[in-house]
């Protein structure tokens, strides 16, 4: 199941879904870090909500490929990133030269605010047309799946099975206000035949609990707080590789596919414009994709 580029109707539904919340996200992953050469002559500010492991590897790879650019990184959840961008706009203007998000919905809203500089990147024939616009480009394909506690029986076979009384109070959901991929899932279920807002209402009625972030879903299932959850397949794979007692449950009606977009902002000017374009080229290159 592929998530489309943008769903304007999803935001009101985010406010109406009414799934029980456990609390707001904390900015534990937000930081200002840098990867640079001591002789750096250009500065680049990156705002991102991608996983820490991903951004660390990519920025380190870029520093090796282009040591003349110093990259300062602000990483946070999608909700915190949106708040930072709004604060920038109310205090002198956007400070990010590049924004790298985890869902197309949030990036589309930034594009509508005219925060991005249109630039058709050259030499990127391998990027599917569905994963790029005039303003931003898809960098990684993400999949939302079900994570289950190891040994759980019976296992759910479909997304709708999460509303079964057999799993009452045992399902964890990521907060759409904090996690871009969770927001994308909300947008998908809103428009998918057989789901709609009623799916979230059924989850709520079945005792599903909303937690702060995508990684927290996996952690809570691993620790036995819940038996099931909705999360990214990459988080489940990493947890399994680390020995966590969880398994990945790929629904028979399909995982939810979305992409992680990146864009140059209108704040990137002069040398920052050159650095931003170099960074985008790297992220979308084979080296950046394999970082």
Question: Predicted regions span which residues?
Answer:
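A ligand-binding cleft/hinge motif common to bilobed small-molecule-binding domains
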Residues: 105-109, 227-247
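C-terminal motif of bacterial Sec signal peptides marking the signal peptidase cleavage site
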Residues: 18-21
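Extracytoplasmic ligand-binding site segments that recognize negatively charged/polar headgroups
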Residues: 45, 49-56, 76-82, 94-226
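Bacterial signal peptide processing site
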Residues: 23-25
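A bilobed periplasmic-binding-protein/Venus flytrap-type ligand-binding module shared by bacterial periplasmic
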Residues: 145-152, 187-190, 259-272, 291
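Short, polar/charged alpha-helical segment
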Residues: 39, 44-70, 80-82, 86, ...
